C-alpha cells in the first residue's frame, strides 16, 4: 500500500508531480490507481528535461500528453503543476504532495544562464581542490567529524588530465551543478507559495534523495558525448562520470547502486514550523532509512496503516519506525538492524557495525561506521563473530523478503 493510498483513506487530498518510476506498463500501476488524485510527470525513470517524448514522455492524470513546446524544463514544470494542484483545491481538507524531481539524474541538460554560473569554478579548481574544500566545509558545519578521512579515490588527479579533458569534464560538472541549482530555486518557489497562502507553518516538509550520486556508466570522464549535452532528443546519457560522482559523495566511498556509504547515505531535511519550531537548525545523527518515511507520516497525520487493502487482500505489515523520537532527541536508536540490497549489492547495519557484500567483492566486509564512516578499514578478520552474526541476519531477512537474484521466491 502506498502513502497516498493510506492518506486518501484518511481524508487527505493527494497530489503528485514529477518522476513516478514505479510501473508504467499497465494503467493499474500508474499514480491515480495507487492513491493519487492528480498527477503530472513522467512514468519512466528518466527523460529529456527539454522535450520529454515517447515512452519517457509526459502524463497528466491518466492521459498521455503531446511533446511540450520549447521553452520547457521539467524541474520548472513539475513545480508549477505541484503548486497548481494545491492552489486548485477548493476545500479545507489537508493535502499530501509528493514532488519528485528527475533532477539531477542524467541526461545532462540545464538552462544556459544557470550553467554559466558554475563553469569557471569547476574549470579553475578541478576535482581535487573542490573535494578538499567540501570536506573542510562539511567539517565546519558539523556534518562530519574533524578526523574523517577521504574514502579511496578511483580516478586520476586533476593535474594528470589534458587541458582538453579538463575543459570537457568541467563543463559536465557545471551542467550538473546547474541542474541542482534549478532544484534549489524551485523548492524555494514552492515554499514561498505555501508561506504566502498561510499553509507553510502547518505543513510537514521532508526533503531527501533516494541514493548517492550516480557514476553511471562508471567512466571517469562521464558517459555520452559533450556535444550531446542539452540535446532535447537525449533522454539517457550524457552524464558527469565517476570522478565527479565521488566528489558529490565527499567524503564517502563509491556511489549509487553500491551499498557503501556513497551509495546509500543521503541527508534528510525536515521542517514543520508549528510542531518542530524548537528544533530549528538542529542535527539528528540517529540512522534511519526510507522505510521510516511511511510511519513518520502516519504519526504526523494520525492515519492508520491497514491490515487489508485492494479488495480485502491481506498486505505486508508496516516496516520501519517513525523518525520523530530521533528528531525530538528521545532515542539514539530507531532500529536493531537495517538492511539493504540493490543489484546484488548487500549490506546490514547493527549499531556501529556495518557488513557489506559488494557486487565486485568475493567476501563480506565489516566496518565500524561510527569510527570509520568512509569504510577504509575492513575489520572482518579482527571480528569474525560479528561478521558471522550479521551475515546470518541478512540471509534471514533476504529469505523472508524474497530478495533477488540470490533468493528467488519459492
Which stretches of residues belong to each language-model region?
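Formylglycine-dependent sulfatase
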Residues: 1-365, 369-410
Amino acid at each position: 500500500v502506498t502513502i497516498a493510498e493510506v492518506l486518501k483513506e484518511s481524508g487527505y487530498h493527494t497530489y503528485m508531480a514529477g518522476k513516478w518510476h514505479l510501473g508504467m506498463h499497465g494503467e493499474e500501476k500508474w499514480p491515480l490507481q495507487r492513491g493519487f488524485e492528480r498527477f503530472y510527470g513522467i512514468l519512466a525513470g528518466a527523460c529529456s528535461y527539454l522535450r520529454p517524448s515517447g515512452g519517457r514522455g509526459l502524463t497528466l492524470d491518466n492521459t498521455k500528453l503531446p511533446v511540450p513546446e520549447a521553452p520547457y524544463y521539467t524541474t520548472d514544470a513539475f513545480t508549477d503543476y505541484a503548486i497548481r494542484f494545491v492552489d486548485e483545491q477548493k476545500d479545507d481538507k489537508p493535502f499530501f504532495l509528493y514532488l519528485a524531481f528527475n533532477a539531477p539524474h542524467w541526461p545532462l541538460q540545464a538552462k544556459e544562464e544557470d550553467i554559466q554560473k558554475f563553469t569557471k569554478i569547476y574549470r579553475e579548481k578541478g576535482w581535487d581542490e573542490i573535494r578538499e574544500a567540501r570536506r573542510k566545509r562539511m567539517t565546519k558545519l558539523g556534518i562530519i567529524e574533524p578526523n574523517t578521512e577521504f574514502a579511496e579515490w578511483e580516478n586520476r588527479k586533476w593535474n594528470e588530465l589534458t587541458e582538453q579533458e579538463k575543459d570537457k569534464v568541467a563543463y559536465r560538472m557545471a551542467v550538473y551543478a546547474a541542474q541542482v541549482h534549478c532544484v534549489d530555486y524551485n523548492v524555494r518557489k514552492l515554499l514561498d507559495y505555501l508561506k504566502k497562502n498561510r499553509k507553510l507553518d502547518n505543513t510537514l516538509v521532508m526533503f531527501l534523495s533516494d541514493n548517492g550520486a550516480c557514476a553511471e556508466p562508471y567512466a571517469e570522464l562521464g558517459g555520452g558525448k559533450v556535444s550531446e549535452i542539452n540535446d532535447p532528443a537525449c533522454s539517457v546519457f550524457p552524464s558527469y562520470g565517476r570522478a565527479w560522482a565521488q566528489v558529490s559523495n565527499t567524503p564517502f566511498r563509491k556511489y549509487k547502486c553500491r551499498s557503501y556509504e556513497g551509495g546509500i547515505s543521503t541527508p534528510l531535511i525536515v521542517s514543520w514550523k508549528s510542531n518542530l519550531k524548537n528544533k530549528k537548525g538542529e542535527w539528528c545523527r540517529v540512522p534511519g532509512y526510507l522505510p521510516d518515511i511511511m510511519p513518520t507520516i502516519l504519526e504526523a497525520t494520525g492515519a492508520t496503516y491497514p491490515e487489508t487493502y485492494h479488495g480485502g487482500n491481506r498486505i505486508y505489515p508496516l516496516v520501519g519506525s517513525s523518525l520523530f523520537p530521533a528528531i525530538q532527541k528521545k532515542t539514539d536508536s530507531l532500529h536493531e538492524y537495517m538492511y539493504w540490497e540493490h543489484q546484488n549489492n548487500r549490506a546490514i547495519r547493527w549499531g556501529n557495525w556495518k557488513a557489506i557484500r559488494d557486487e565486485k567483492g568475493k567476501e563480506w566486509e565489516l566496518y565500524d561506521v561510527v569510527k570509520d564512516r568512509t569504510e577504509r578499514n575492513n575489520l572482518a578478520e579482527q571480528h569474525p563473530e560479528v561478521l558471522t552474526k550479521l551475515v546470518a541476519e541478512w540471509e534471514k531477512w533476504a529469505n523472508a523478503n524474497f530478495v533477488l537474484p540470490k533468493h528467488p521466491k519459492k
